[in-house]
Amino acid sequence: DFCLSRGLGDVYKRQILIIAFLMFNFTGYSQTTSGQEDRAYWVNMLSQIADPLLNNMSKGELKKNMPIETISGMPNPSNARTTHLEALGRLFVGMAPWLELGPDNTQEGQIREKYIRLMTESINHGFNPQSPDYLNFTVTRQPLVDTAFFCQGLLRSPKQIWSKLSSETQKNILNALQQVSKIKPVESNWLLFSAMVEATLLELTGKCNIHPIEYAVMRFKEWYKGDAWYGDGANLHIDYYNSFVIHPMLLDVLEIMQKHSKGEVDFYRKERQRFSRYAEQQERMISPDGAYPVTGRSIAYRFGTFHVLSLAALNDLLPTTITKAQVRCGLTAVIKRHLAIKGNFDEHGWLTLGFAGHQPSIAERYISTGSLYLCSTVFTALGLPATDEFWSAPYAEWTGKKIWSGNPDVKLDKAIKL
């Protein structure tokens, strides 16, 4: 009875209202934005991530100025030799589709023109043996990984980047791919790095060593576990490597094979369906407030975990159960949830080790500053023009937000059997 007395009851009411208000705003239920606003936010965040890297490397000063943060607090020789190629290759793969739209008279088009210039200048330095920023393609096995990511970037920007590079830089890139192709991959997702390099050589020159491609395809047929999940090797790992590497690179390789009349049509068609199903699962992982399960290794790649979902939107591979608008809104919620937390960037704008802010202890020994730029792959859908439905459609709730708010308009989830 005392607790329900008038005075204390008012206090409780005020406290409840304050808590409800904070929860309501924190979860973003009232924060609906237009596609135009979301696109501007994405461009701004991608620019913020890219600026320190490209502004330095375009002048040949990346190695001079980029920090090398590791879990130990000290860069080991392996990190120091490979982190710069990691940074360029990983930023490029996520940024390339947007750059490929090319410059135009809009404000965004002028921003793109600037980054096309910075990216080409950075690539010139990275592949020029006389540049202080010449990258390592031979020492340790890590260059295989990040050259493969770089290759994806090239394939995603053939007009605005590859064709605008000088013939000398193009020759230097092809020489680097030949060097990297000698690195032997381990029996895991690494097989796709070798396949990606060879597929890129096939696309750019018409020639390649077909064996690494055929071997990787054979292995991933064997390692398929069902419902769009591949093993990372013989075993299934509950992590995000199906999104970081496996689905994007496998589909890229298979598409190039089909383009050059090589490989099986049947497996290519199956992979397209599996890719769509995995994208569907990723969309359902996003909670009402933009959080998602933190599981498995390499979580320091932050929202790069959603590479497949963003790429599915770009390549028109979303399943019929979800709309482009709800993918845009869900991914925007994820990006905002991460970046609302302080500490993701250091005082000079470089990404820091962490998942939500600065958390060095969550980084594996193979992760350093350059590794973190794989987060850029969430921005892949920026390769869709502003007029596309992805950006022009009004705000839409994603599945997690719909179902937790009691919205009856939710589709059943169903596994695929192929």
What does each model-identified segment do?
Residues 94, 236-353, 360-387:
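Long, repeat-rich segments with strong aromatic
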Residues 27-29:
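Sec/Tat signal peptide C-region and signal peptidase I cleavage site
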Residues 1-15:
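Single conserved hydrophobic/aromatic residue that forms the stacking wall/gate
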Residues 107-108:
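Long, charge-dense tracts
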Residues 16-25:
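Bacterial N-terminal signal peptides
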Residues 55-79, 127, 132, 334-418:
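CBM-like carbohydrate-recognition segments
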Residues 84, 95-98, 112-272, 284-307:
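Aromatic-lined, polymer-binding surfaces characteristic
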Residues 31-87, 93, 97, 117-124:
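Low-complexity, Ser/Thr/Pro/Gly-enriched N-terminal "stalk/linker" regions
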